[in-house]
Amino acid sequence: MRLDKFLCDTAGVTRTEAKNAVKKGQIAVNGQVQKAADYKVKENTDTVTFQGRPLSYAAFHYYMLHKPAGVITATEDKKESTVMDILREEKVKNLFPVGRLDKDTEGLLLITDDGELAHNLLSPKKHVDKEYLVKVRDSISEDDCRKLSEGVDIGDEKPTAPAKVERVAEKEILLTIREGRFHQVKRMLQAVGNEVLYLKRLSMGSLRLPKDLEKGAYRPLSEEEIYKIKGDK
C-alpha cells in the first residue's frame, strides 16, 4: 500500500494532507523518516508514526454507540445534530450508521465503514434479530402480545413477520423483530390500539448494548464482538 494511502486510511487526512506530511518529514516507517509518498508500506507489519504518534491499520472500523434521544441517525444534516457528530473526534473517513433509529429512540447503534457487513445485517433475507425495550401508554394484554408475536397489519402490503414478545411489566414489553420497516415498532403497537412512549434498542444480532455504556457514549468493538457479528450475516 502507498504511504499516502496508508495515512489517509489511518490518520483521517486527505491525500493532499498526507503528501504534505510526508514532504515535511513528519512520517517515519520502522524508525526511519520517509519522504516518498509512493513508498510501499506493509500495512500489517511495518511500524508507521505520524509526528511521533504510532498509526495502526485496520481494513474496517467498528464502533458501538449508545444513541441518545434528540439526535438523528444520519451522516450529516444542516439543521439537526446527528449520531456522527458524537464520533467527530474519530479520524476515520466514510463512517456511517448501520440502519436507523428514530430521533426519539435510544439504544444500540453500530457505526462502521464496512459496507458489506452493513448490507448483510440489514438484509431481510439474513433474519438478524433486533431486540427493543418498549414502554407504552396503556396496559398491554396477553392477547396483544399474542397478536404482535403472530404478526399484525401495519398498513403495508404484508403483515409484519412473526416476532418474539415478552411482557415484563403492565406497560412494558421486550420485542424482538427481524424486519426493519419504517417506524415498525411504533406502528405495531398502534395496530393493537396502543402507543409507544419510550423505545430503546438493546441488541442487534449477537451485539448487545452493555449496561455500563452511558447514553451518548461509544467505544470500538472488541475483536470477539467483530467476529461474532460477522457470523450473524
Please describe what each predicted stretch is.
Residues 1-233:
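Basic, flexible Lys/Arg- and Gly-enriched helix-loop patches that mediate nucleic-acid binding at interfaces
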